Amino acid sequence: MVLSRLNPIVKQCVLGNRPNLVSLGPVRTAVYSKSGGLLPEPHRTSFGIIRLILTVVPGLLIGAAISKNIANFLEENDLFVPSDDDDDDD
């Protein structure tokens, strides 16, 4: 998508001040065929709840393990030690 937006700019820089030689309209080769007709809609892969769970749950577990290890490291090296004085809700 970025290349299709840069294509007219590059052509204009190469050709200089001769904009009548180049079309500065958008180039959408992913939507239209060379003859100008619309391409058929691409096949959609179903994204089921099982795939979602198999993707999200391991990420959450890995993130929790990393956070736990970092918290233990900080507490062991006395970089951050939670104090009981912060729990004053009265």
Curated annotation (Swiss-Prot):
Q: Work out whether the entry's keyword set contains Transport.
A: yes
Chain ranges sitting on the Mitochondrial matrix side read: 1-48
The protein's superkingdom reads Eukaryota
Give each disulfide bond as a residue pair.
none
Q: Which residues cross the membrane?
A: 49-76
**Protein topology in the membrane:** Single-pass membrane protein
Give an example GO cellular component term for this record: uniplex complex
Q: Name one GO biological process term.
A: calcium import into the mitochondrion
Residues in the Mitochondrial intermembrane compartment per record: 77-90
| Keywords carried by this UniProt record | Calcium, Calcium transport, Ion transport, Membrane, Mitochondrion, Mitochondrion inner membrane, Transit peptide, Transmembrane, Transmembrane helix, Transport
State the Pfam families in the record. DDDD (PF10161)
UniProt entry tagged with the keyword Zinc: no
Indicate where this protein resides in the cell: Mitochondrion inner membrane
Q: Which family does it belong to?
A: Belongs to the SMDT1/EMRE family.
Summarizing the function annotation, the protein's role is: Essential regulatory subunit of the mitochondrial calcium uniporter complex (uniplex), a complex that mediates calcium uptake into mitochondria. Required to bridge the calcium-sensing proteins MICU1 with the calcium-conducting subunit MCU. Acts by mediating activation of MCU and retention of MICU1 to the MCU pore, in order to ensure tight regulation of the uniplex complex and appropriate responses to intracellular calcium signaling.
Could you give the subunit structure recorded for this chain?
Answer: Component of the uniplex complex, composed of MCU, EMRE, MICU1 and MICU2 in a 4:4:1:1 stoichiometry.
Record-given protein name: Essential MCU regulator, mitochondrial
The organism encoding this protein is Tribolium castaneum
Protein's gene? EMRE
